[in-house]
């Protein structure tokens, strides 16, 4: 390594770049040594345009020194490569951006047979099972064009939105306990879901190792009033139309038959309950690290051995939060079906309002993967990334056995969204994972300071998009200018072969917290 010319033995930008090498037009490798103690290399997927954002962030970090803010995503990716039990590589997808501990858009898998392998709440995120569901209809854009303002208002009236929004799905503390344990089975039992909804949901809407006793009283207290609510931030319910079909066979299997077909996309997570589960676990894990002598490069990467009581407790509590998020999306699907039924004076069944699929973007799951020719049981952390299993995988629904698992990619407010399908190459390269959305390009703070919410709302109106927002001043944080271009992200994954484009959706109405 060349001479260090920055104070404190820090490397220059050029010296940092010596550790990064392009492997293919869409893939870079981070060599061991980029940060101390790397056990495996890092890999990140970017195209020419997205790599500029990645490297600018690194350059700013070098210029600024280790002062304030999150580390750049590429450093976070490398720090994850130092965790005990990590297998093969630490992976970042094209929508990657800095997060707490792990970057958002980071995938890492840990060997369940290694007694030192860890689980890290930072590798799942605070909004456990933040995810997306798409519901189809048999309506055409022309059926809703004249009434989209009314339809947006109807959705806004039906679905509780915003930061402190409270649910209208009645439940008691005992009901919450059951929902945490049962996930969508609870929704089905209570009449808020159709039996076939479960078939088209990752994990069939229920993590089986959920144990409500591992969820703190404080988390339950936060979760009880928020069941069936949308929340704020980047969460939304959007009425969309099919804009382009890239893979007719896959689209047909999803019940997507024509351009202009009306769809509904719901993006939400586990609200305050999931946040509290993560916070509680981080406190416990800091103690476990001291006890077990686990050292990490960044204290935000607090973790515990998977086999330890803290590791097991977290996985049980995380599963409860995941179940809660599926109940949440099911409740909102129920409310959304009601809103459409009222507006069109037809039953949701007559409107063909079936769930196409429901995916999680923030979760850790035990899966089997082939590593170096050997089948291994791994704990796969996906934070800001989506499971994308290939055709014929046993864990995807019968309907999608020939197409691969549908992967739902939400755009930013007012931009297009995509439905992709999983591929065999993704299974080999990224533990069956792909991107989850656009990925932030500006911090929330920067967006608030640089953008004007009235302008952002005006722009959406000029695009012909009906919008209902509970907290208008939070809109700047979610403006398209705050994010990377979702099409660039999706195309990078498509070109890399880790997922395949099937359908493009365009928004006509947005409901936001």
Curated annotation (Swiss-Prot):
GO annotations of cellular component type: nucleus; tRNA-splicing ligase complex
Family of the protein in this entry: Belongs to the RtcB family.
Annotated SUPFAM superfamilies: Hypothetical protein PH1602
UniProt-annotated binding residues for GMP: 234-238, 361-362, 410-413, 417, 436-439, 512
EC number(s) stated in the UniProt entry for this protein: 6.5.1.8
Signal peptide: none
InterPro entries according to UniProt: RtcB, RtcB-like_sf, RtcB_euk
Anything else known: Ligation probably proceeds through 3 nucleotidyl transfer steps, with 2',3'-cyclic phosphate termini being hydrolyzed to 3'-P termini in a step that precedes 3'-P activation with GMP. In the first nucleotidyl transfer step, RTCB reacts with GTP to form a covalent RTCB-histidine-GMP intermediate with release of PPi; in the second step, the GMP moiety is transferred to the RNA 3'-P; in the third step, the 5'-OH from the opposite RNA strand attacks the activated 3'-P to form a 3',5'-phosphodiester bond and release GMP.
Protein task: Catalytic subunit of the tRNA-splicing ligase complex that acts by directly joining spliced tRNA halves to mature-sized tRNAs by incorporating the precursor-derived splice junction phosphate into the mature tRNA as a canonical 3',5'-phosphodiester. May act as an RNA ligase with broad substrate specificity, and may function toward other RNAs.
Positions contributing to Mn(2+) 1 binding: 127, 130, 235
Cofactor: how and how many bound: Binds 2 manganese ions per subunit.
GO biological process: tRNA splicing, via endonucleolytic cleavage and ligation
Keyword terms, alphabetized: GTP-binding, Ligase, Manganese, Metal-binding, Nucleotide-binding, tRNA processing
Name under which the protein is recorded: RNA-splicing ligase RtcB homolog
């Amino acid at each position: 390594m060349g001479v260090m010319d920055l104070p404190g033995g820090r490397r220059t930008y050029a010296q940092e770049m010596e550790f990064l090498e392009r492997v293919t037009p869409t893939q870079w490798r981070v060599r061991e040594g980029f940060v101390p103690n790397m056990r495996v290399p890092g890999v990140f997927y970017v195209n020419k345009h997205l790599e500029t954002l990645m490297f600018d962030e690194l350059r700013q970090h070098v210029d600024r020194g280790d002062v304030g803010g999150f580390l750049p995503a590429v450093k976070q990716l490398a720090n994850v490569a130092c965790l005990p039990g990590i297998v093969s590589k630490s992976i970042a997808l094209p929508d990657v951006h800095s997060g707490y501990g792990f970057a958002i858009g980071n995938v890492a898998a840990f060997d369940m047979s290694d007694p030192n392998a860890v689980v890290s709440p930072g590798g799942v995120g605070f909004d456990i099972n933040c995810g997306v569901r798409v519901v189809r209809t048999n309506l055409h854009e022309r059926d809703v064009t004249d009434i989209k303002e009314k339809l947006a208002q109807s959705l806004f009236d039906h679905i509780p939105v915003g930061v402190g929004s409270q649910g209208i799905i009645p439940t008691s503390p005992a009901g919450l306990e059951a929902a945490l344990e049962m996930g969508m089975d609870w929704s089905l039992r209570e009449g808020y879901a159709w039996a076939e909804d479960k078939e088209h949901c990752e994990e069939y809407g229920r993590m089986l190792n959920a144990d409500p006793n591992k969820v703190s009283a404080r988390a339950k207290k936060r979760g009880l009033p928020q069941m069936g609510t949308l929340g704020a931030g980047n969460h939304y319910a959007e009425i969309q139309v099919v804009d382009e079909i890239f893979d007719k066979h896959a689209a047909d299997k999803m019940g997507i038959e024509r351009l202009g077909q009306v769809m509904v996309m719901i993006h939400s997570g586990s609200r305050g309950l999931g946040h509290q589960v993560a916070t509680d676990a981080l406190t416990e894990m800091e103690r476990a690290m001291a006890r077990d002598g686990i050292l990490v490069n960044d204290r935000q990467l607090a973790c515990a051995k998977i086999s330890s009581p803290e590791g097991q407790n977290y996985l049980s509590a995380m599963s409860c939060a995941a179940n809660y998020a599926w109940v949440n999306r099911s409740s909102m699907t129920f409310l959304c079906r009601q809103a459409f039924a009222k507006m069109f004076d037809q039953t949701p069944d007559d409107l063909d309002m079936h769930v196409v699929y429901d995916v999680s973007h923030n979760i850790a799951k035990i899966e089997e993967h082939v590593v170096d020719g050997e089948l291994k049981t791994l704990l796969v952390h996906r934070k800001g990334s989506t499971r994308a299993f290939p055709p014929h995988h046993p864990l995807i629904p019968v309907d999608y056995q020939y197409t691969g698992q549908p992967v739902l990619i939400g755009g930013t407010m007012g931009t297009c969204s995509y439905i992709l399908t999983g591929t065999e190459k993704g299974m080999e390269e990224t533990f069956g994972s792909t991107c989850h959305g656009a990925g932030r390009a500006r911090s929330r703070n920067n967006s608030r300071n640089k953008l004007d919410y009235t302008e952002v709302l005006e722009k959406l109106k000029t695009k012909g998009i009906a919008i209902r927002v509970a907290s208008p001043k939070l809109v700047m944080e979610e403006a398209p200018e705050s994010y990377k271009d979702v099409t660039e992200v999706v195309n990078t994954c498509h070109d890399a072969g880790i997922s395949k484009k099937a359908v493009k959706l365009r928004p006509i109405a947005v409901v936001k917290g």
